[in-house]
């Protein structure tokens, strides 16, 4: 089984389950969480975390979705990590524009941007007693690359011709040197991804080793980690128990024990949050979370600086979207405010541009939202020269209530400008295939980059002729700028390039950005510390 062709984006915690689109790999109907009675005010009791979807794998080198790598990352360290900044309601949140050392004590970058030298702490050990050293980091990165799953794409920043990484050298136990084939200002963020986690070679070798392009079944449900938590027990699709690693090289985590329940039944999620059985609930539908807004049981926290968005794809190779005037017209025929209020319960931000508001490259001035203006849309349709009425079929995932609501609302407004929209509900596999095989005439989608950086995003989402470019966007002038920004290391010049790409993107109206999604977490009144990161980081969570 190979995953090298998997699209390099992440499925959103708190969104996928909220949409009712549960990955088939999760198998069972979940669990009722009956074992979560230990939640409450006792600080010595386990922290109980309910998550709406179970991971398909916990191997950081193989996982693609946030449910996979977000859970898995807590058992491992990486050379770097995201910085932190203040969040809403007294919480903190990750800062994608600030990358800091994690396992590395120091980082030196050569003047030409090609050679990275990492100094590592001495004496760190895996639970097996093996050293967590430069050889372990080298082995782990090379394992991820050789397996050729999503992890390899993340570590390479999506750059394969030539491969971003030229050589990895363990000069001594505390010195690791990585040489690149070309400068890449985003490389330190690539190393902050769970895909760059440091694994115990002795455990992997004893349990299947590395096979190029293939999954390691043992690592799919076991940890071989170096991180803040040990995996004490794991029942796939049901629950997991994590205990603080007494030999962790860094600061001990805030919680000594965390009980994770995987629950895909939203009424159960809501009941356990309201009753106090769960300390932290992730993935509850916004409708349910909205019912808790004024409930003294809980604190509902919405992080606006998220990096995911709800979109309507209008593939350029399909009529009528090959006409830029038609593409522009439909962007003015979407009642954004109504959708944000009725569908997202206010937990969303309107904008129009290639970068989400939570991304460092976002420029608010260049990303002003399109207004709902039917008369302007009608005028643009007339200017397009396209005869109306036009029949368009939009694919949505079956059971996805949010995207069905969006499609239904748009169906009504587009009728006013001469577009008859047929809503086609597809089973999950058929829906994904219709996009990845570029068969869909239009589609709804929740999207966002696996690595939260503009160059990485543009490298798969906008380049002409890239199969990952699901809407077949093609702006040749922008392609040249994307190639330039991928190798530019000066922050000011990079932002200038990102801004110019945004201008070109907006001019072409390549798709509809319905809204930037806010991530909603529900915390019990006993939770004192919570940190939002698009990949769950349990280290500071506690009560």
What are these regions (language model features)?
Residues 119, 154-207:
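Surface-exposed binding/hinge segments that line
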Residues 229, 349-383, 398-404:
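Structural transition elements
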Residues 83-86, 93-94, 193-252, 257, ...:
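Gly/Pro-rich hinge or "lid" segments in bacterial periplasmic/extracellular proteins
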Residues 50-111, 142, 224-226:
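N-terminal lobe/hinge region of extracytoplasmic solute-binding protein
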Residues 121, 217, 245-291, 411, ...:
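Ligand-site clamp/hinge motif
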Residues 325-328, 340, 370, 416, ...:
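Extracytoplasmic/peripheral linker and loop segments enriched in polar/acidic and small residues
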Residues 236, 265, 359-360, 382-449, ...:
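Ligand/substrate-recognition segments at binding pockets and active sites
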Residues 521-543:
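Long beta-strand-rich cores associated with HINT superfamily self-processing modules
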